[in-house]
Amino acid sequence: MLSNKKPLKGSKKLINAWAFYDWANSVYSLVITTAIFPLYYAALFVENNQIFFMGYQIKNTAMISFLTAFAFVIISFISPILAGIADFLGNKKRFMQFFVYLGSFSCIGLFWFDLNNIYTGLFLYFLALIGFWASLIFYNSYLPDVAYPEQQDQASARGYSLGYIGSVILLLFNLSLIMLPDFYGISGTPQEARFYAMKISFVCVGLWWLIFSQISFFYLPKGEKKIIQKKNIIFHGYRELKSVYDLIKKNF
């Protein structure tokens, strides 16, 4: 049973709760980004690799590359702004939760990604990418709040190891779904069964991410409110980036 008492900074419980978000979200980077979704996407367009978009025929691989690049542009632009707003409001947990829910539900929505829903599927892929990387920004910003400087390397390593273990476990399960669909009661032709199993793997990623992140959210603090003038909220994050850049220049 979870205790309502919030653990103190530097405590093993709080550091483990923070690191456990790696267990929750790393399945996205392994299953969606690396292993299964690229195979599903390629198989989807094996007969016709062209996507009609805004009056142009675009190759499917180029389309996903453009969409990924555009998502990273959006993330790089909004992240400092969101960081400034979160610092002003003192509630970065809410921002992190928003992007976790955005990403996880978008992954679940990929279940319906097929040739009849190309644009919806690509949009969900885009939202999942935004949710994943934006949530990591707030997740990483929590490290100084949960661990003292001498603990931070160990805490990061713990998160990395948990993420590796968790993502491999789910990947192995998803691969078993795809390779042995009959064992799990998935019917149809071999190709239909594999396609359906891949879709189920996207749902598994979304649910895994959504459910296990709740452990981190239960224990993580709300966030400390920083004293920032309202007129400086929007550009506060950019100013912090500049100060980091100046510090790097000074030391290197």
Give short role names for the model-derived ranges.
Residues 195-218:
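Symmetry-related core transmembrane helices of the 12-TM Major Facilitator Superfamily/SLC fold
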Residues 156-179:
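Glycine-rich segments within core transmembrane alpha-helices of 12-TM secondary carriers
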Residues 5-72, 118-122:
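Helix-loop boundary and gating motifs at the non-cytosolic
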Residues 2-16, 221-252:
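Juxtamembrane intracellular "pre-TM" segments in multi-pass secondary transporters
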Residues 145, 181-184, 213-229:
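Helix-loop junctions on the cytosolic side of multi-pass membrane transporters
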Residues 100-138:
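Hydrophobic core of transmembrane alpha-helices in multi-pass small-molecule transporters
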Residues 124, 130-161:
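Cytoplasmic helix-loop-helix junction between adjacent transmembrane helices
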Residues 86-102:
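Cytoplasmic membrane-interface "Motif A"-like loop-to-helix N-cap segments
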